């Protein structure tokens, strides 16, 4: 449905050239939800704006539903864009128009009949859960309701693709959840292909089928959500996955934690990161028996994404230095990421 082939975008600044995208290729199948994740300034917004040519690539091709947009005339591009809806972080609603009138605007611009507009917009407001707000004005809506209006407006022309540019980043956590569930329902019921960009791995984990990681304008990793969570190949992907966990040491340990052991009875506090098959394997108990170390688990958390389990365990590891070293090596050989957080006396 969406094919980006070798997309490069260079901005000409007064004193230099800025490469926002560097030879990016991405393929999204029909009906998929794909998330592009990256830090601020990584090139995410530029990438998504290249899909409907709000930003024209310096080089490369953009193909949507079999049509190469980069080869269309201005008139042809206007028509092709009707198949591509888009929502933004900011809702861009017209304050002087009601909810119904805001959603109806694209159909009015296409000179649709009043009867068709009435039928279509009524159905869309029902879909996004705003039937009772049809005559309300944006000033009387919450942030989540405003985004629902924007989503309905983006769907008014029956697009095959929906682009979401940081659509939940201005919303509180509870509202974010409701918008993500709405997008997932729209994908399921309408079969619409969704490309969203975000800096939050939690968003990707909840609704995406596919994920691409972008860093400094380059696509550094991509695959299904399950593949990326089970076996992240880049440090950036690992950082994003870790950000979905909220685990910490008990205060008693934090107060006594040191970077280096102060004496022979100072034992390491180690964080073990499990993904894929290593989650279910009894590796910690095996290591304990094999090398004669004792592991006192301080905190642990397991989660799912894309049908794959992943998680962390933080433990105090007691034993002689050689045994602890062998334990760490053994676990790393079995695809467990090992990080010494410090030592307790």
Swiss-Prot record:
Location of the protein in the cell: Cell inner membrane
Gene label: metN
One GO MF term: ATP hydrolysis activity
GO cellular component, one term: Gram-negative-bacterium-type cell wall
Known catalytic reactions: L-methionine(out) + ATP + H2O = L-methionine(in) + ADP + phosphate + H(+); D-methionine(out) + ATP + H2O = D-methionine(in) + ADP + phosphate + H(+)
Keyword Cell inner membrane attributed: yes
Membrane topology annotation: Peripheral membrane protein
Top-level taxon of the source organism: Bacteria
Keyword Membrane appears in the UniProt entry: yes
Protein role: Part of the ABC transporter complex MetNIQ involved in methionine import. Responsible for energy coupling to the transport system.
Species the sequence originates in: Haemophilus influenzae (strain 86-028NP)
Keyword list, A-Z: Amino-acid transport, ATP-binding, Cell inner membrane, Cell membrane, Membrane, Nucleotide-binding, Translocase, Transport
EC number: 7.4.2.11
Record-annotated ABC transporter domain positions: 2-241
Record-listed ATP binding positions: 38-45
SUPFAM superfamilies: ACT-like (SSF55021), P-loop containing nucleoside triphosphate hydrolases (SSF52540)
Stated family: Belongs to the ABC transporter superfamily. Methionine importer (TC 3.A.1.24) family.
Listed name of the protein: Methionine import ATP-binding protein MetN
């Amino acid at each position: 449905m969406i094919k980006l082939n070798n997309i490069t975008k260079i901005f000409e600044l007064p004193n230099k050239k800025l490469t926002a995208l560097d030879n990016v290729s991405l393929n999204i199948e029909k009906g998929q939800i794909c998330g592009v994740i990256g830090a601020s300034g990584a090139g995410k917004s530029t990438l998504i704006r290249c899909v409907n040519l709000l930003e024209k690539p310096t080089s490369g091709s953009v193909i949507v539903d079999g049509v190469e947009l980069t080869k269309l005339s201005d008139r042809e591009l206007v028509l092709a864009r009707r198949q591509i809806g888009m929502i933004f972080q900011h809702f861009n609603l017209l304050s002087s128009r009601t909810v119904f009138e805001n959603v109806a605007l694209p159909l009015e611009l296409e000179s649709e009949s009043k009867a068709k507009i009435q039928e279509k917009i009524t159905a869309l407001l029902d879909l996004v859960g705003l039937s009772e707000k049809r005559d309300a004005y944006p000033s009387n809506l919450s942030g989540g309701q405003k985004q629902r209006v924007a989503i309905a407006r983006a769907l008014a022309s029956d697009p095959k693709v929906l682009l979401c540019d940081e659509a939940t980043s201005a919303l509180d956590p509870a509202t974010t959840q409701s918008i993500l569930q709405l997008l997932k329902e729209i994908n399921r019921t309408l079969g619409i292909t969704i490309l969203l960009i975000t800096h939050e791995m939690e968003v990707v984990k909840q609704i995406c089928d596919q994920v691409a990681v972008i860093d400094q304008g380059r696509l550094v990793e991509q695959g299904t959500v399950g593949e990326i969570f089970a076996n992240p190949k880049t440090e950036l992907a690992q950082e994003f996955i870790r950000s979905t966990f909220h685990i910490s040491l008990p205060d008693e340990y934090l107060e006594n934690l040191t970077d280096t052991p102060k004496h022979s009875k100072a034992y390491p506090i180690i964080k073990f990161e499990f993904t894929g098959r290593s989650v279910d394997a009894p590796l910690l108990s095996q290591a304990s028996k094999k090398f004669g170390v004792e592991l006192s688990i301080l905190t642990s958390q397991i989660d799912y994404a894309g049908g794959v389990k992943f998680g962390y365990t933080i433990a105090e590891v007691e034993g002689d230095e050689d045994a602890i070293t062998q334990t760490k090596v053994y676990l790393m050989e079995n695809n467990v990421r090992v990080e010494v957080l410090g030592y307790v006396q």
